Amino acid sequence: MAKVGKNYQEAVKAFDRAALHEPMEALAVVKKIAKAKFDETVEVAFKLGIDTRHADQQIRGALVLPHGTGKTRSVLVFAKGDKAKEAEAAGADFVGAEDMIAKIEQGWFGFDVVVATPDMMGMVGKLGRVLGPKGLMPNPKTGTVTFDVAKAVKEIKAGKIEYRADKAGIIHAPIGKVSFSEEQLYQNYKVLVETLVKAKPAAAKGQYIRSVTVSSTMGPGVRINPVKAN
């Protein structure tokens, strides 16, 4: 743990933490100061000018990053009949119905994303207490409740991510790994920013993107100028 602390302290000294960087510059700094012995995830945090106490200012959705996240996610699909076959053909890791529900009720969570056809949601809804807290409950807003299970699975495997503003109006999202090139990270970042701008609630007042910070898994946050966020 001391070694991790030492690396972090060295990283902090390597740049001006108060400075507001251009996006590409910030990403270059994050890559430069990443010292962990594993391929760290690069994550962006956006503080938005929204009041999530109001239903019309809650932001949630999904998008496909052009270069993916660098991580292959395992997908569980709740479907029957032809839809189950379509999910399997598209590359779903687990496909089932009552059998999968029984496994989850027994404590199994060997998957990263859950997709369900609409007709299965009555059954899947019973798992809300265990899937909800883990952020695994299928939702139409993120495209995980759909009859087009093949498309959903392929998009997730291609690098689809979900985003959601927390109570403080902050959105955290991965945009790749430190092994990605600066250009790949920037292109992923740019698509994310454009998506969030399009998702701006009509009721939101004042500056929308208040602050932006990018960091690697074990590294300190590098600030991006919110005025030049994209």
Swiss-Prot record:
One GO location term (cellular component): large ribosomal subunit
GO biological process, one term: regulation of translation
Keywords: Repressor, Ribonucleoprotein, Ribosomal protein, RNA-binding, rRNA-binding, Translation regulation, tRNA-binding
InterPro entries membership: Ribosom_uL1_bac-type (IPR005878), Ribosomal_uL1 (IPR002143), Ribosomal_uL1-like (IPR023674), Ribosomal_uL1/biogenesis (IPR028364), Ribosomal_uL1_3-a/b-sand (IPR016095), Ribosomal_uL1_CS (IPR023673)
Matching Pfam families: Ribosomal_L1
Membrane-spanning ranges: none
GO molecular function: rRNA binding; structural constituent of ribosome; tRNA binding
Function statement: Binds directly to 23S rRNA. The L1 stalk is quite mobile in the ribosome, and is involved in E site tRNA release. Protein L1 is also a translational repressor protein, it controls the translation of the L11 operon by binding to its mRNA.
PANTHER family linked: 54S RIBOSOMAL PROTEIN L1, MITOCHONDRIAL, LARGE RIBOSOMAL SUBUNIT PROTEIN UL1M
Quaternary structure annotation from Swiss-Prot or TrEMBL: Part of the 50S ribosomal subunit.
Family: Belongs to the universal ribosomal protein uL1 family.
Protein name as annotated: Large ribosomal subunit protein uL1
Species the sequence originates in: Desulfitobacterium hafniense (strain Y51)
